[in-house]
Amino acid sequence: NTVSSFQVDCFLWHVRKRFADLELGDAPFLDRLCRDQKSLRGRSSTLGLDIETATRAGKQIVERILEEESDETLKMTIASAPAFRYPTDMTLEEMSRDWFMLMPKQKVAGSLCIRMDQAIMDKNIILKANFSVIFDRLETLILLRAFTEEGAIVGEISPLPSLPGHTNEDVKNAIGDLIGGLEWNDNTVRVSETLQRFAWRSSNEGGRPPLPPKQKRKMARTIESEV
């Protein structure tokens, strides 16, 4: 049920935090850890449950499961689980770097937040992203950023910690929003080959994904009106 699910999530987050404290986690692991922490705080407030108490209860649930779990069953479970991969266009420095906007524009699309600097004009821009992949398809966006040729960050798409969960289509639509807003100011935008491959399952030499017609004008107007 909802309470026991929250308790198990709290304990598993605690285990992952201990792992991170040993400096064993990579960038996607640490990013998910931070986002999940914010999500757990929100769920704690909604359910009226103390996180520390829930963590102890979650530990007891997990221990009971492990006591009943045979090694053979565990091997079969692991073998049948789909394998995730984590393509990384951006370095840790590019992901963690602070950036500022002269003319900030922001739009919330479902569980994704789209931000861009509309003071940027006549630039060549590339979209890079770090994300998880399952069955050769983008599963979860960790972070997407728009970079100029000089390396400046001028746009971003990030999941909202308070609204976890998004689909491949959500990500593609958000990318369309961002491209439309940037191209409104005569910037030339291309998408990294890695992102094209796993989001659209295609690769275009010009770096342009197959966005629906009129999306550029529509999305640019939407971003302008909603902020």
Curated annotation (Swiss-Prot):
Major localisation: host cell
Molecular function GO terms recorded: protein serine/threonine kinase inhibitor activity; RNA binding
Chain intervals for the UniProt region annotation (CPSF4-binding): 177-212
Subcellular location: Host nucleus; Host cytoplasm
Placement of sequence motif Nuclear localization signal: 31-35
Annotated region described as Disordered, given as residue ranges: 202-227
PTM entry text: Upon interferon induction, ISGylated via host HERC5; this results in the impairment of NS1 interaction with RNA targets due to its inability to form homodimers and to interact with host EIF2AK2/PKR.
Family, similarity comment: Belongs to the influenza A viruses NS1 family.
Free-text note regarding domains: The dsRNA-binding region is required for suppression of RNA silencing.
Annotated protein name in UniProt: Non-structural protein 1
Organism listed in the record: Influenza A virus (strain A/Chicken/Japan/1924 H7N7)
Lineage: Viruses, Riboviria, Orthornavirae, Negarnaviricota, Polyploviricotina
